[in-house]
């Protein structure tokens, strides 16, 4: 059978001979566009024996109905993908398994010369991938599949981490697809995007969370804007609610409390900074515990716990972090106790945040209020005024359910938030 499947009859034949497992990549109209702002161009499908191209909207082939293709893909028991969060914009997630969590593959490293030339010269075209020959898309994805096979990511001996593949991925997909409201005039004044259409639609700009970081802490940069480190001051006034008001919840003394939970320590008053001054706390948890402060009970217990954790790390195959995930030794350069503690803090921070966000997303189902931005110790909500009284107390309660107190700030834009 030819590798381009462009009729319903050909797809039916492929369906009759399908296996339980497959590998799929939805190729968008433009790789540089945010997935919320583009549509499928082609689908690369590999059944374990041969790779195929299923055309959706390409200049060289007849179009297969996208709903029929979706039905075909979802009929498989296991669909392996690179980047499940991206594929959730096009496919249901129940049978998607993200092999990037086993071994990350940079798709751009396999771009053909044609891909490179078109993306350099025609990056602004919304449907640039429909101009690149199908044979070149096929060549690229055949190479990616071959390399992934060599890395054994499809092997039954390697399982995708359940927490990362389910809760973690779904939470950040749900957040990301909301976008965040902007005043376009102010935004253009303070931020320089690579190409506006890649991430902006009307009064909304789309963020993009990168989930493939060593400690699982996601970064968030897209189209030339780093949303995880937005400059303070007037630049933040560029972000405005699409509903009525911005409400931010941020955790108080988050990292000291996370550490206390990890080592089973309880602060006497409940506030870490009543026991240890804030400056001393931060110097010692991030820079190593100094001898002159080691007498603090919190630091004494942390030192003992960290000694044992470091011993386990050296004896085992790697560092076990939150979510039953492991960072292998070969991925940790020049390991030491401070680095191990930092990695653990970041992983547990992300883990507890995901659990809280999952609960809040359930609360917001069917509501106008949306979560529009996540940073490591805070979330920003675009709140509808009709939902303020009922929703906000419940959201605060869910955020604090794991024992981490929050502060609430309110403002008409992101630069005008005032603590309440």
Task: Give each language-model segment a name.
Residues 169, 173, 177, 205, ...:
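Conserved catalytic core of nucleic-acid polymerases
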Residues 81, 97, 240-255, 279-298:
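Conserved catalytic palm subdomain of right-hand nucleotidyl-transferase polymerases, strongest
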Residues 87-93, 389-398:
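Short, aromatic/basic amphipathic alpha-helical patches
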Residues 89-192, 265-267:
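Mixed-charge, glycine-rich, non-catalytic linkers/tails in nucleic-acid processing enzymes
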Residues 1-114:
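Conserved RNase H-like, two-metal-ion catalytic cores of nucleic-acid enzymes
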Residues 27-29, 83-85, 100, 131, ...:
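Anionic group-transfer/hydrolysis microenvironments
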Residues 31-40, 44-49, 55-62, 184-276, ...:
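Acidic, glycine-rich two-metal-ion catalytic cores of nucleic acid-processing enzymes
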Residues 107, 177, 260-265, 283-287, ...:
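Short, well-ordered loop/turn and helix-capping segments at boundaries between secondary-structure elements
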């Amino acid at each position: 059978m030819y590798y381009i499947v462009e009729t319903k009859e050909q797809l039916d034949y492929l369906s009759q001979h399908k296996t339980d497992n497959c590998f799929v990549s939805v190729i968008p109209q433009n790789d540089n566009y945010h997935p919320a702002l583009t549509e499928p161009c082609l689908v690369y499908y590999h059944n374990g024996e041969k790779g195929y191209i299923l055309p959706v909207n390409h200049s060289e082939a007849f179009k297969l109905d996208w709903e029929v293709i979706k039905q075909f893909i979802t009929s498989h028991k296991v669909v392996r993908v690179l980047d499940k969060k991206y594929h959730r914009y096009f496919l249901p997630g129940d049978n998607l398994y993200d092999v990037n969590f086993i071994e990350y593959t940079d798709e751009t490293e396999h771009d053909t010369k044609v891909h490179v030339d078109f993306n350099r010269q025609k990056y602004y075209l919304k449907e640039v991938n429909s101009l690149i020959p199908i044979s070149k898309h096929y060549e690229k994805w055949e190479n990616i599949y071959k390399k992934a096979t060599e890395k054994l990511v499809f092997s039954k001996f390697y399982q995708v981490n359940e927490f990362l593949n389910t809760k973690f991925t779904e939470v950040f997909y749900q957040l990301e697809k909301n976008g965040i409201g902007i005043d376009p005039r102010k935004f253009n004044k303070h931020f320089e995007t690579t190409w506006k259409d890649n991430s902006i639609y009307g009064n909304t700009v789309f963020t993009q969370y990168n989930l493939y970081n060593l400690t699982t802490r996601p970064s968030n940069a897209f189209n030339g804007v780093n949303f995880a480190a937005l400059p303070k001051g007037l630049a933040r006034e560029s972000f405005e609610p699409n509903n009525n008001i911005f409400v931010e919840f941020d955790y108080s003394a988050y990292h000291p409390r996370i550490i206390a939970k990890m080592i089973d320590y309880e602060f006497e008053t409940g506030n870490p900074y009543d026991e240890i001054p804030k400056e001393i706390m931060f110097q010692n948890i991030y820079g190593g515990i100094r001898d002159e402060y080691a007498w603090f009970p919190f630091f004494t217990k942390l030192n003992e716990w960290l000694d044992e954790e470091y011993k386990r790390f050296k004896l085992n195959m790697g560092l076990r972090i939150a979510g039953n995930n492991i960072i292998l030794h070969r991925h940790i350069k020049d390991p030491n106790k401070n680095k191990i503690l930092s990695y653990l803090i970041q992983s547990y921070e992300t883990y507890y945040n995901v659990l809280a966000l999952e609960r809040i997303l359930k609360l917001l189902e069917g509501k106008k209020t949306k979560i529009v931005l996540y940073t490591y110790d805070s979330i920003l909500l675009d709140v509808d005024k009709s939902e303020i009284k009922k929703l906000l107390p419940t959201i605060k309660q869910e955020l604090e359910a794991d024992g981490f107190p929050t502060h609430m700030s309110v403002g008409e834009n992101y630069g005008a938030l005032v603590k309440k």
